[in-house]
């Protein structure tokens, strides 16, 4: 500072090497800078199923499900969704509360190669209508209790707890999505107040898990 009295404080690096390393660890900068792995979310999940199938994958509301159980349940849903024409490049809306079933639905959609569009059941009807019209899902996965909110939208509705899901095979699908495929479409409020959909690819998620 004495050497250059005109130098601005904002241009000076006041952290030592140890402090900089600590800041980078807190910000997970390494995850953002390293190249994305060549795996999709279902591929990373499949590796974990093989590695520790009996471990608890999800716990919510007093319920727990193992990686094997989550894998088989999501496979059943994926097979049913495919029978309804769901596949890569398409979107499936999820009108579900936070629950074990919601995680099953997410994995089931991802295994088809489609992207999921999460919708909080607490949103007003106007917001629900906007997201459904804007996202253009081919199927909506929900529960019997929430199905009435989808009346009049002309969409195929799948009950996550329905007999049609449980009658499907639990065998794995033969094709996995590409890491560059869109994993999900999340809607933000937008600067104008109009919800805006942001597409997130698989590799944006998996690089944080490596």
What is the meaning of each model-derived region?
Residues 1-17, 29-206:
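Carrier-protein-dependent adenylate-forming modules in NRPS/ANL systems
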């Amino acid at each position: 500072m004495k050497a250059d009295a005109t130098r601005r404080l904002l241009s000076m690096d006041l952290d030592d090497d140890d402090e900089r390393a600590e800041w980078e660890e807190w910000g997970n900068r390494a995850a953002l800078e390293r190249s994305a792995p060549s795996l999709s979310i279902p591929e990373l999940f499949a590796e974990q199923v093989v590695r520790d199938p009996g471990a608890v994958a999800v716990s919510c509301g007093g319920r727990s499900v193992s990686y094997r159980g989550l894998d088989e349940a999501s496979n059943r849903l994926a097979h049913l969704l495919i029978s309804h024409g769901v596949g890569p490049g398409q979107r499936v809306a999820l009108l579900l509360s936070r629950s074990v079933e919601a995680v099953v639905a997410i994995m089931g959609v991802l295994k088809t190669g489609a992207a999921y569009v999460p919708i909080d059941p607490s949103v007003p009807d106007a917001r629900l209508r906007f997201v459904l019209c804007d996202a253009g899902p081919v199927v909506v996965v929900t529960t019997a209790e929430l199905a009435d909110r989808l009346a009049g939208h002309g969409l195929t509705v799948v009950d996550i707890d329905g007999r049609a899901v449980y009658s499907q095979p639990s065998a794995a699908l033969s094709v996995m999505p590409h890491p560059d495929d869109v994993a999900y479409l999340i809607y933000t409020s937008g600067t104008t107040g109009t919800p805006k959909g942001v597409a997130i690819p698989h590799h944006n998620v998996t690089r944080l898990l490596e």
